[in-house]
Amino acid sequence: AKSAVVIGSGYIGAEIAEQFSVTGVKTTLVDGLDRPLANNFDKTITDQVAAAFEEHGVTLAFGQKVVEFRDNDDDTVTVVTEKGEYTAEMAILAVGFLPNTDLLKGKVDMLPNGAIVVDDYMQASAPGVYAAGDSATVFYNPTGQHDYIPLATNAVRQGLLVGRNIETPTVKYMGTQATSAVQLYDLSLATSGLTRAGAERRGLTVRETSLTEDYRPDFMLTTTPVTSILTWDPETRKVKGGQFCSKADISGAANVISMAIQAGFTID
């Protein structure tokens, strides 16, 4: 294909759009939110991502919900949004996840979206029923509550725990910080725990401290800036999240934040 419209600018949609653009495919990226990776990073960082997309010729159509797909006689498809129309040889949907759990509706406790609530041993509220991965909740350590965070890392760990615990409960789930990272063009991005927007969606109050500084001293032959954002609880002063963006590989920094959240460290 020589042209494509990608609907959804989370991790999957953003990576697809990036790969299309670097291989010469004319790409349009559509999202109902006003910026890419909006559920993962603050605007300070996503502005850098948006600029990288535009530098590589990607048309950004943000703040637009898709209302229709229209097949054309020339084997193209037109994606119709609230604000415009985008025609390409293919349209790709990357709009998130929904648990496919109707089989157990009314039989086990679930979140409003259908995610099965599990205990420390991955068991649902009904005896003998276990759940893992994108069908199940995780225990989200930054909030101390059950949440729905469909990441492969969570799915792998939960699947292992089901295997260990299905006969006899022996190994408890430690919870998750939802640490993740992505490389888009020459930008390395990593995050762990809550962003300010994520906290607000959950009715929580947090503060943020941000810093942009070179990742190593100026006297080194090569260096490059790193944008760092630390999220913390103003009452307990506990670390609740961190975000990083740089042309240097800063993915390991998110692991440090993850450890700090898990251990209950404060900013002091």
Regions found by a protein language model. Give the residues of each.
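FAD-site-proximal beta/loop scaffold in flavoenzymes
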Residues: 1, 78, 85-161
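Mid-to-C-terminal Rossmann-like scaffold of FAD/NAD(P)H-dependent oxidoreductases
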Residues: 135-248
